[in-house]
From Swiss-Prot:
Residues 692-774, 798-869 form the ACT domain. Its cofactor is Mg(2+). This is Bifunctional uridylyltransferase/uridylyl-removing enzyme. Residues 450-572 form the HD domain. The gene is glnD. PANTHER family: BIFUNCTIONAL URIDYLYLTRANSFERASE/URIDYLYL-REMOVING ENZYME, BIFUNCTIONAL URIDYLYLTRANSFERASE_URIDYLYL-REMOVING ENZYME. Its EC number is 2.7.7.59, 3.1.4.-.
Amino acid sequence: MTDTPAERPDPGVAGDADWAAQARPLLVHVDMRLCKRFDQGEPIERLVALRARAVDQLMRNAWMRCIPADSGLSLHAVGGYGRGELFPRSDVDVLVLGDTAAQQQHEQALARLFALLWDVGLPISHAVRSPAQCTAAAADQTVLTALIESRALVADAQARAALATAIAPPQVWPPRDFFQAKREELLARHQRFGDTADNLEPDIKDGPGGLRDLQTLGWMALRAFGVKDLEALVGLGHVGFDEAAALRREREELARLRFGLHIVANRPEERLRFDYQKTLAERLGFADDPESLGVEKMMQRFYRSAALIRRISDRLLQRFEEQFDGEATPEPLGGGFSLRRGYLAADTESWPDGDVLQVFALFAQWAAHREVRGLHSLTARALAEVLRDLPAYEVADATARERFMALLRGPRAVETLNRMARLGVLGQWIPAFASVSGRMQFDLFHVYTVDQHTLMVLRNIALFAAGRADEHFSIAHEVWPRLRKPELLLLAGLFHDIAKGRGGDHSELGAVDARAFCLAHRLSEGDTELVTWLVEQHLRMSVTAQKQDISDPEVIHRFATLVGTRERLDYLYLLTCADIAGTSPKLWNAWKDRLLADLYFAARRALREGLEHPPPREERLREARESARTLMQAQGHDDVTIDRQFAGMPDENFLRFRPEQLAWQAASLIEVEIGQTLVKARRAVPDNDALEVFVYSPDRDGLFAAIVATLDRKGYGIHRARVLDAPHDAIFDVFEVLPQETYADGDPQRLAATLRQVLAGDLQKVRPARRAVPRQLRHFRFAPRVEFSESAGGRRTRISLVAPDRPGLLADVAHVLRMQHLRVHDARIATFGERAEDQFQITDEHDRPLSESARQALRDALCACLDPV
């Protein structure tokens, strides 16, 4: 393929069908050759230009076949095609310009033209307008945006001039109005994506820091200054040479991703979906290594490109604004700082190269003045220029380290860290943070990059400090005031994931980094040990709460022994809450809040009472009964009634549930006689979606499986299930559930009524629902793993199941257990993105632990049911 593509169908071919039959393979041939050159690493700017020129020839050839030379019509490329850029599967946007008489006269010829182009395989998007109609349509700035980049394909000088005049500023959209409209459009577009590019499946084109941001800057420059590209603004003083070069470099990075994505997807796909990420990474040459997957490297490069584009575009938008509005009189703040139109400006000419003290002073001023809108563009640019010369903390002097700690202890510390991270200063001061900036993990559990997750954790800590966490974190506001030094929690949050991607245990490696940082910044040995311990153990509370039975005193004793002190417990609890809630917007819920609070209070009590002599079982039973009795008495129940209900409840019940749960269960049992079935449901936490379902029933084959299948059909996700043997051959089933699907209405009364109806029927007819696996989950399949161990002193068998998550998973597992004639005594459900990690305590139908042969039969049945292959 030459730089001026010569491939074109024979213009002498008589029939349109024959002409299209010649043109189609030629277009395919062009794309194949461009793909080959793409794989060879040719610049994307050249490839998209070559494809546009190849399509130009087809367009002109088709025009000459269909439209008379004296038609009075002209053909113009608009939009991206007008810029001379065509990605492999992009639309081909064209404008036919001519007066209304010419449009009507040649209506059939135009229809023939567009049909012919579609037949060739070109995704044509067309408009037919007169100059006056162009002026009217351009009242919509999106239409104007497409027209200002028009390029004549078949048009004389008069037609080109007519189009230019129709959309000139005196007619529509003066430059200042256009700038404001495009800026508002950009901000609104960013909001649609959560104002971050750090999504699991980012949009290369329209997402924050994407190609559309660069195009927006170009449109503004074209309308305001009449220049075709941002490089031309360097000479006008609006853009620095380094900024223009950086934007050009990052544009090439994103354009290469987009070009490859179109090839891999074979459609105009703009989102880096999981469907394509791995294939695209392989095509671009990103290889796996022991520390990172190739796809993670590719995504990190994307996130870093998007972040840099956002930083520079923010500066340019501010400069464009100043160009229209003019500079305001500076408002001195002292120390070489001032406010200019609400932006913080520094006398950067007096900054020595690499003077980190001046940089830290800048952030201190920013934190001290809430009215600051942001950094002045010239100051932000100066900061970017000195960034590479700033020392890391390891080689900085003691004064600089003291200034950093002052920022950490000062007002709005989390905002300051966020700003430092966004502007690259934090990564320069702590190189390990720069290493994880933009780093993603190829799974569905971590929905943010490591640096973005870290900042989300710090943001949650700031909520604790501001007292605004009560709604989502039930006891954080009680724990926060007890912290001796809040900055230690910030440091633990900053370092807890800083070693991800190095290989090895990131908690241990991060603890080494945290200790070195604390010692370098002259923290006391006690403070250093606390931060180091928090980083090393930051997962411990979450794992204990979600994967172990925290109603078991041995579990609490082990956890409390590990923690050792009330101070460590307070810090670890807050770090754990902030960490889980900062991992994914959907991960934190009322159930996890209560679970962690229960573990916190149980550990706090164990520490208070002493770890050497934990209370015996009989004492714990007595305390639980008395606490529940007090609650029931307050509700008006007499002791005779209370004793009768307590007698119908298994002892283990009093060790597994909180007093208010016991009181609710006992009060509910007043309504039922022996041999009857009772179903009750309530909100586990007032004003929250979490529900607690209590089922009292004669023991029946398939009871647990039927309840689980019904909850699944109604759209509820089960987080915990407990099955206890009660007197008179009855069963206590207690489920903690949350609405998981949109059709789960969250009404406890309706849910209880549905379960009553199901349990009144034939349980053997209740089957799990069949639902499709969501698209994202399909790309994270792995073979299930089933492990067995003893529990409850050897009286039960514990199953640990790790499998790809999917709708109805627990219902299918329950069905398998039923078909194997096994009894479920406890179920703990945990989902981590695409991974379901569930634990069950079971026995055979005679209440005995499973034999080796029964274990193997169950393993085979579960793997056959859950294996994604």
